[in-house]
A protein has these predicted regions:
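Conserved mixed alpha/beta core segments that line enzyme active sites in large multi-domain catalysts
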Residues: 275, 280-283, 287-326, 381-741
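Substrate-engagement module of ASCE P-loop NTPases
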Residues: 122-123, 128-155
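Long, compositionally biased, glycine/small-hydrophobic-enriched stretches that function as flexible linkers
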Residues: 204-290, 299, 451, 507
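A conserved helix-loop-beta module that forms one wall/lid of the active-site cleft
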Residues: 293-358, 364-366, 371-384
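Conserved inter-motif catalytic segment of the P-loop NTP-binding fold
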Residues: 58-123
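Charged, amphipathic alpha-helical linker segments immediately N-terminal to NTP-binding catalytic cores
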Residues: 1-8
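Glycine-rich P-loop/Walker A and Walker A-like loops and their local beta1-loop-alpha1 context
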Residues: 13-67
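Phosphate-binding/switch region of NTP-binding enzymes
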Residues: 1, 151-207
Length: 741
C-alpha cells in the first residue's frame, strides 16, 4: 500500500518534514503528539530542524516553548513564536502558562517543546512530569495540533514513562550505532505496516527497516550494553537525589568529603521536599540538618512537598530538642507519615479534575464547577503504585487509630493559617485490612475534596491566593492516647498560644501565654463546641479563671468528652461520667473532682450530687505541666521570633512522668483587618466615639474605618422579629460598597 501525503478530504497532511519518516509512520494525523526518546538533545535536533522549516514553508503557525537549559532548538527571527518560560514557578503556574498560550494559538498550530526531562529536574519529580504530559497532550490533540516532545532515555521511572507512553499518539526511540542514526517506532496510533515497528536506519534521506535477525541482534545488543541497568532505570529524579544525599552524608561523616557539600545538598532537598517559603526556609536551615531530611523521606509516600502542617510539627520538635535536650524525654515520640503534594496533583489529573482546577485560577469563575469537581474527587481512584504504599503504611500502624490531616503548601505559614478551611479526619482504624484501607482512602479523598469547598476558595480569593500553587499534602499521625475499655483518647489536649490575647484580669501576663485545655481528644479545644466549655489557663496565673462566681467550677466545666469509639469504629462525644466509668486506670484526681465534694459547703455532712467535675486543679498545681508548657511556648516563640499557636496532647505514664505530644505549631494569626498594636497613649476627647474601661478580651488592632453605622437600639427593639433580619442584610450591603478614598 503506497503512502499518500493527503488526507481523505484531499487537503495536505501534516508532516515531520522528512518524507522518508512520514512513509515509515504512514503519515502524520492532525492531533499527533510525537515523543522522541533520545540519549541527548543532539539526537533531537536532526528531527526538529526539518519539522520547523517544513511547517513554516507551509505557512503553518509554529510555537516554540523554551524552558530547558540545553541549546536553543528554534532560533529567533525565522518566523516562529517563542515563549520563554521558567519551570521554577511551579507545576500549576507553568502548566497554566503553557495552556493559555495553546488556547490563544488555536487549532492546527505546530509546536516544538524543549526536552521534557528538564521539567523533572526543576520539579524534582518524575511524577509531575508524567502529570504535565497527561494534561497537556490531550489538549493539543483536541485542537488538532502537531507537536514534538523529547525525553532523555533511562532518566525516568517506569511510572513516568508509562504515563507518557499511554497518552501520546507516537513514541519513537532514537539511537546511534557507529556513525549512523536509527529510529525505532514504539507506538503509532491508528496506523500499521508490516515493518513499522522495526528499527530503521537513516541514510540518503530515507529510513530503511532492519529486518534481518543477524543485523538486528548486533545493533540492539550493543545498544543494551551501553545503557544503565534495569534497577537504575526504575529510579526517578527524586530517588537519585536522595541516594546522592545519603552517600554524601556518609562520606562527610567519614571525613572523605567537606561539610560544604552536605550543606549544598541540604539546601536543594529542603526546597524539594520541605518548603519554598523563604521565612520557613531560613528557620528550617537553622534547626534541621541533612539527616532530618533523609528521615522524612523514609516515611514519605509519593514525592513533592510535605506541606505547612508537617513542616510546623517537625520544626517545633527540632527547636525544642536542640534548645533543651531534656525535651527529648518530655516529648512523645512521633512516627508520622507524609503524603507528598505530588500525589494530590496526580489524583486530580488521573480522575479528570484538572480542568476544574485550572478554572479556579480565574478570579471571575473560580467557584464555577467546584462542586462537580468536589463530587468527582470523592468518587475517584488512586493509582496502583500509590495504593500499595498506603497499604504498607496501614500495615505499619496496625489497628492503632490515626488522623488524616490536611497539610497544604500555604497552610500554617506566615500570614495564612487556613484555620478550619481544610478537613482533617480521624480513622479509628478497626476492622479487616480492606475495611481499614477503604476508610483511609475515603479520608484522603475528603481532605482533597475540601480544597474545592466554597469556604476554602473564598478564603484564597479574599487573600489574593487564587493564582498561587496551593497543593495539598497530607500528614498522617498516630492518635495520641490509650485504650480505655471500648474507647480511645488522650488524657488531656489543648491549644497553646505563646501570647495571651484574653486578658481577663490585671494579674495576667500576656507574654506568659495561654492554654485552652480539654479532657480527651483536642477537637473541643480547636473547634470550641457551643454546647460545652473548655478550661482557659493563663500560664502565669493558672487558677485564675475568666468566669466569676462561687460555683464557677461546676457550672463552667467541660461536660462531654470527644473520643474514638473502637467498638463502633467512629468518632464520638460521650458524657464525662460515662467515659470515667470505663477508665479505672486513669490518674483521675489530676483532672477531676467529685461533684459532691465541690457542692458541699464547709461543715456540711449531707451527701452531694453524684458524678465528676473536670477542674484540672491538681494537674495545674501539683505537676510540672504548666511550667513545661510555658517553657515550650517560650522556646518556640523565641525561635520563630513571632508569637506561635500550637496544638498538643499530654498523657501521664504509670511512673508519673508526663509525655507531651506536640502535633502542630504555626505562627499565631491575627484576625484579618488589623495588626496587633499598642494602644495610643493619648486620644483627644473630641476624637473618641466609643470608650470602655476594664479588661479587653482579644487583641488591640489598628484599622482604617470607612464609615460608622449606628443602629438605634430602641427603634431596633420595636421592630417585629421577622423584620430585624432586614437590618442585618442592609448593613451587609453597605459593608460591601466600594471604599471611599
Amino acid at each position: 500500500m503506497a503512502f499518500d501525503a493527503t488526507t481523505n478530504s484531499g487537503t495536505e497532511s501534516p508532516s515531520t518534514g522528512l518524507p522518508g519518516l512520514d512513509r515509515v509512520l504512514r503519515g502524520l494525523l492532525p492531533g499527533d503528539n510525537i515523543v522522541w526518546q533520545v540519549d541527548g538533545v543532539e539526537d533531537y535536533v536532526p528531527f526538529v530542524d526539518p519539522f520547523v522549516h517544513d511547517a513554516l514553508a507551509r505557512g503553518k503557525r509554529l510555537v516554540y516553548f523554551r524552558f530547558a537549559r540545553h541549546l536553543e532548538l528554534v532560533p529567533p527571527g525565522i518566523g516562529a513564536e517563542i515563549h520563554r518560560l521558567s519551570p521554577e514557578v511551579g507545576f500549576e503556574t507553568f502548566t497554566a502558562q503553557i495552556h493559555k498560550a495553546i488556547e490563544e494559538a488555536g487549532r492546527g498550530t505546530y509546536y516544538v517543546f524543549d526536552c521534557l526531562s528538564d521539567l523533572a529536574a526543576d520539579w524534582y519529580s518524575d511524577l509531575m512530569l508524567g502529570n504535565f504530559f497527561m494534561v497537556t497532550c490531550p489538549y493539543l490533540y483536541d485542537l488538532e495540533t502537531v507537536t514534538f516532545f523529547a525525553l532523555f532515555r533511562d532518566c525516568h521511572s517506569f511510572d513516568a514513562v508509562s504515563a507518557i507512553r499511554g497518552t501520546t499518539q507516537i513514541l519513537i526511540d532514537v539511537f546511534r550505532h557507529g556513525e549512523r542514526l536509527y529510529v525505532h517506532p514504539l507506538k503509532v496510533d491508528h496506523r500499521h505496516s508490516p515493518t513499522m515497528y522495526f528499527p530503521h536506519v537513516w541514510g540518503d534521506g530515507d529510513f530503511l527497516p532492519l529486518t534481518e535477525s543477524a543485523v538486528l541482534s548486533e545493533v540492539l545488543v550493543e545498544l543494551t550494553e551501553r545503557r544503565v541497568d534495569a534497577v537504575s532505570r526504575t529510579l526517578d529524579m527524586w530517588d537519585r537525589k536522595l541516594l546522592q544525599a545519603r552517600e554524601v552524608l556518609e562520606e562527610v561523616e567519614l571525613g572523605i568529603r567537606p561539610e560544604g557539600e552536605a550543606t549544598e545538598i541540604f539546601r536543594r532537598l529542603l526546597r524539594m521536599m520541605v518548603t519554598r517559603d523563604e521565612r520557613l526556609v531560613a528557620l528550617a536551615s537553622r534547626w534541621l540538618d541533612l539527616s532530618d531530611l533523609l528521615a522524612i523521606r523514609k516515611r514519605m509516600i509519593g514525592t513533592g512537598l510535605i506541606g505547612g502542617k508537617s513542616v510546623g510539627m517537625l520544626l517545633a520538635r527540632a527547636i525544642l530538642c536542640r534548645t533543651n535536650p531534656r525535651w527529648k524525654e518530655r516529648l512523645e515520640t512521633h512516627d508520622s507519615y507524609y503524603i507528598g503534594s505530588d500525589v494530590f496533583y496526580t489524583y486530580l489529573v488521573r480522575n479528570g479534575c484538572w480542568r476544574a482546577r485550572r478554572e479556579q485560577r480565574n478570579v471571575e469563575t473560580f467557584l464555577d464547577g467546584a462542586e462537580r469537581a468536589r463530587e468527582r474527587i470523592l468518587s475517584g481512584d488512586f493509582p496502583g503504585f500509590i495504593r500499595e504504599q498506603f497499604v504498607a503504611m496501614l500495615e505499619y500502624f496496625g489497628q492503632s487509630p490515626i488522623i488524616v490531616r490536611s497539610s497544604s503548601l500555604l497552610e500554617d505559614s506566615f500570614g495564612n493559617a487556613f484555620t478550619g478551611k481544610y478537613d482533617s479526619l480521624f480513622c479509628p482504624n478497626q476492622g479487616s485490612p480492606q475495611q481499614r484501607l477503604d476508610a483511609f482512602l475515603s479520608a484522603v479523598r475528603a481532605v482533597y475534596a475540601s480544597t474545592m469547598s466554597s469556604e476554602a476558595l473564598l478564603y484564597r480569593s479574599h487573600r489574593g491566593l487564587i493564582d498561587r500553587d496551593e497543593q495539598m499534602a497530607i500528614l498522617v499521625q498516630r492518635v495520641s492516647g490509650a485504650v480505655h475499655g471500648h474507647l480511645f483518647y488522650p488524657q488531656v489536649a489543648g491549644v497553646g498560644l505563646s501570647y495571651n490575647p484574653y486578658v481577663w484580669s490585671d494579674q495576667i501576663d500576656p507574654e506568659a501565654g495561654v492554654v485552652r485545655l480539654v479532657f480527651g481528644l483536642g477537637t473541643r479545644a480547636v473547634d470550641r463546641a457551643d454546647d460545652d466549655y473548655t478550661r482557659m489557663v493563663s500560664l502565669n496565673a493558672p487558677l485564675r479563671r475568666p468566669e466569676a462566681g462561687r460555683d464557677r467550677g461546676p457550672a463552667y466545666s467541660q461536660r462531654r468528652v470527644d473520643v474514638l469509639d473502637l467498638s463502633a469504629n467512629r468518632f464520638s462525644s460521650e458524657g464525662i461520667d460515662d467515659v470515667i466509668a470505663v477508665s479505672p486506670e486513669l490518674p483521675l484526681r489530676l483532672y477531676a473532682a467529685k461533684r459532691s465534694d465541690l457542692s458541699r459547703g464547709a461543715g456540711e455532712t449531707r451527701p452531694g450530687p453524684a458524678g465528676w467535675v473536670l477542674t484540672f486543679e491538681r494537674l495545674l498545681t501539683e505537676t510540672s505541666f504548666v511550667p513545661d508548657l510555658r517553657e515550650m511556648l517560650g522556646i518556640l516563640r523565641d525561635a520563630y521570633e513571632y508569637p506561635v499557636d500550637t496544638e498538643f496532647t499530654a498523657n501521664f505514664l504509670p511512673d508519673g512522668r508526663c509525655r507531651v505530644n506536640l502535633v502542630q505549631c504555626r505562627p499565631l494569626q491575627v484576625k484579618e483587618g488589623g495588626n496587633i498594636v499598642e494602644p495610643p497613649k493619648r486620644i483627644p476627647r473630641d476624637a473618641l466615639v466609643l470608650e470602655s474601661r476594664g479588661p479587653v478580651i482579644g487583641q488591640s488592632s489598628l484599622s482604617l474605618i470607612d464609615r460608622i453605622l449606628y443602629v438605634d437600639p430602641e427603634a431596633y427593639s420595636a421592630l417585629p422579629v421577622r423584620e430585624r433580619g432586614s437590618i442585618a442584610r442592609l448593613i451587609g450591603r453597605i459593608n460591601r460598597l466600594p471604599r471611599e478614598h
